[in-house]
């Protein structure tokens, strides 16, 4: 058996991270790879397109019902979906209570101890990435995820999140084996999006693995709780996800330690591409009336 690849998809909330990851993993499964998805997002939507389900029961909620994690069996928490992809959701605490990261690491330890990682080619962690708090950085900190793919777009906040996630990877890169595999741009059809994605990848010292074009077939598939590969396998969009999966598959061992940039450098990059205009310091803090009078 080939060595296990532990990859993770990080990205700003709402960027299409879970959709991109599930379509990519479905394409890897089509290629004959054995996949385990470990959802680490409190929304517990990391497996819905694979399982055709609203939200999978999470390890934490099942453990709470059973008494403790020790009272669970692997078959209680693991579901098998499209192309025999195995699916688990770690879950998180109630909003405002506790740390989601603790749930993530509890879940990963439970899965490892109960043989979930046996006879698997890829374990994929789907992780919320707006906040690189200690909790959501768990798969990186604990040296579980070795290869990080950041899903982003040409929007400033998505690039800001990608840069922040890179800072988290850099922090743990030397103590563990974690590396940045590359950026995946999920097109939002903003100005100069491809140019910006490539420019950010260059600044971070990595590569733009793939530019996924926007297509309404993705939404049509999502409404049916399906991946594009299952819903419309002959579509051009399905082929884009297959191409992305091939790029990821061929990228093993090629990850880098990123070189994150400052907020000023990020803004300079946006100005260079004409997305942001330099701020006229003389107008900062002035009301509309004051500006009209000046």
Swiss-Prot record:
ATP binds at residues 11-18. GO terms for biological process: nitrogen fixation. SUPFAM superfamilies: P-loop containing nucleoside triphosphate hydrolases. Keywords: 4Fe-4S, ADP-ribosylation, ATP-binding, Iron, Iron-sulfur, Metal-binding, Nitrogen fixation, Nucleotide-binding, Oxidoreductase. Its EC number is 1.18.6.1. The modification ADP-ribosylarginine is found at residue 102. Transmembrane segments: none annotated. It comes from the Bacteria. It catalyses: N2 + 8 reduced [2Fe-2S]-[ferredoxin] + 16 ATP + 16 H2O = H2 + 8 oxidized [2Fe-2S]-[ferredoxin] + 2 NH4(+) + 16 ADP + 16 phosphate + 6 H(+). Its cofactor is [4Fe-4S] cluster. [4Fe-4S] cluster binds at residues 99, 133. The reversible ADP-ribosylation of Arg-102 inactivates the nitrogenase reductase and regulates nitrogenase activity. Binds 1 [4Fe-4S] cluster per dimer. Coiled coil: none annotated. Pfam families: Fer4_NifH. InterPro entries: NifH/chlL_CS, NifH/frxC, Nitrogenase_Fe_NifH, P-loop_NTPase. GO terms for molecular function: 4 iron, 4 sulfur cluster binding; ATP binding; metal ion binding; nitrogenase activity. Belongs to the NifH/BchL/ChlL family. PANTHER family: LIGHT-INDEPENDENT PROTOCHLOROPHYLLIDE REDUCTASE IRON-SULFUR ATP-BINDING PROTEIN (PTHR42864:SF2). The key enzymatic reactions in nitrogen fixation are catalyzed by the nitrogenase complex, which has 2 components: the iron protein and the molybdenum-iron protein. Homodimer. This is Nitrogenase iron protein. It comes from Bradyrhizobium sp. (strain ANU 289). The gene is nifH.
């Amino acid at each position: 058996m080939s060595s296990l690849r532990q990859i993770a998809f990080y990205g700003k909330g709402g960027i299409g991270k879970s959709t991109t990851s599930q379509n990519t993993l479905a394409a890897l499964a089509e290629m004959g790879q054995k996949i385990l998805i470990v959802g680490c997002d409190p929304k517990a939507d990391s497996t819905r397109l694979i399982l055709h389900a609203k939200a999978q029961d999470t390890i934490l909620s099942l453990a709470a019902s059973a008494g403790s994690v020790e009272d669970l069996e692997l078959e209680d928490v693991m579901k098998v979906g499209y192309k025999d992809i195995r699916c688990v959701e770690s879950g998180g605490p109630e909003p405002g209570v506790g740390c989601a990261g603790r749930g993530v690491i509890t879940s990963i330890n439970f899965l490892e101890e109960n043989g979930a990682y046996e006879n698997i080619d890829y374990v994929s962690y789907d992780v919320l990435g707006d906040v690189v708090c200690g909790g959501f950085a768990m798969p990186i900190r604990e040296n579980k995820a070795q290869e990080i793919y950041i899903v982003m777009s040409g929007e400033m906040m998505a690039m800001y999140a990608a840069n922040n996630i890179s800072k988290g990877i850099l922090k743990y890169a030397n103590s563990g084996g974690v590396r940045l595999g590359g950026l995946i741009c999920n097109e939002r059809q903003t100005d100069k999006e491809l140019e910006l994605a490539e420019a950010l990848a260059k600044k971070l010292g990595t590569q733009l693995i793939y530019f996924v074009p926007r297509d309404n077939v993705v939404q049509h598939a999502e409404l049916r709780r399906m991946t594009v590969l299952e819903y419309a396998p002959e579509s051009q969009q399905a082929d884009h996800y297959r191409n992305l999966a091939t790029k990821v598959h061929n990228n093993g061992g090629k990850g880098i330690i990123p070189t994150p940039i400052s907020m000023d450098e990020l803004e300079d990059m946006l100005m260079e591409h004409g997305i942001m205009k330099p701020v006229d310091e003389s107008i900062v803090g002035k009301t509309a009336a004051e500006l009209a009078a000046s």
